[in-house]
């Protein structure tokens, strides 16, 4: 899939601006603070229902404005069914978020997230490796959400059961009142974990060659999954039963896929705790690119890839390796930088450049 029009209204420093990117490589340059990141942020907002830079109170809506709007038009599908155009709109005002997809109102923003797939690498992406388990669970679930149509229904089933069980635990409910929710949690949780396990195994097969291509010195060799309970010893139903009294005392569910995690392994490093910040960023980027490749294989088309502030996140050597990998893929890529990365110097006709300044985006003449 590739975006053909991105229209942004009253978001951060932009009042009204429109971007028509090419279907290959796109570079947005400009001084720090010019608004380059906000362009990718708008796209991310549509694809994830949240910003990668913090909450709305952090200045997402333009100062003095009451709302923001983002519109995206993109092409998708290139198989037997042919290519089709899709359109989505997102509006935020006060505490309300509303969305439209292909001319129809959506009941939940998840419909927009399911329609438009964007893989984003930004300055905070290192938390995928160096942070807590939540971003790593979210990473797994994003991949499954986009390649397995029934995954969201199953995920919601588990989340609902977990919420109900935790509410009963906080109330000090009698054990018999937990039985039904334990059954629901165990059944949906086992299924959720099986999907995550298979996905991570598949992802590992893609990740190792990707990491070797963009950062061979890392020696990234494997991904290890921790399901959230001792699954090799007991079923989730038994784990919940064994932990029931402790959970009643603590007021929350201590076992299950909501506690799952995964960790990368390296040939020459003791583990992720030994990674420098730069190594954590490279590992995170390798994971994101492997996920994009898996999406492309399963769906028959690439997601949009957004790389924010590439020059400050990676040194010239690794920039070159990443860009070489991306240039060989039929993916639409949007990159922001203060100046043209050396790795794009020879991109030629594949590269479309834009300049961002004073809340405006100017398309520059194509390179020859």
From Swiss-Prot:
Family matches, as InterPro entries: DNA-binding_RecF, DNA-binding_RecF_CS, P-loop_NTPase, RecF/RecN/SMC_N, RecF_2
Keyword Ribonucleoprotein: no
Keywords, comma-separated and alphabetical: ATP-binding, Cytoplasm, DNA damage, DNA repair, DNA replication, DNA-binding, Nucleotide-binding, SOS response
Pfam family, one: SMC_N
Signal peptide: none
SUPFAM superfamilies in alphabetical order: P-loop containing nucleoside triphosphate hydrolases
Residues binding ATP: 30-37
Top-level taxon of origin: Bacteria
A biological process term (GO) from this entry: DNA replication
Chief location category: cytoplasm
One GO term describing the cellular component: cytoplasm
GO molecular function: ATP binding; single-stranded DNA binding
Localisation per UniProt entry: Cytoplasm
HAMAP family per the UniProt record, alphabetical: RecF (MF_00365)
Purpose of the protein: The RecF protein is involved in DNA metabolism; it is required for DNA replication and normal SOS inducibility. RecF binds preferentially to single-stranded, linear DNA. It also seems to bind ATP.
Family of the protein in this entry: Belongs to the RecF family.
Protein name stated in the entry: DNA replication and repair protein RecF
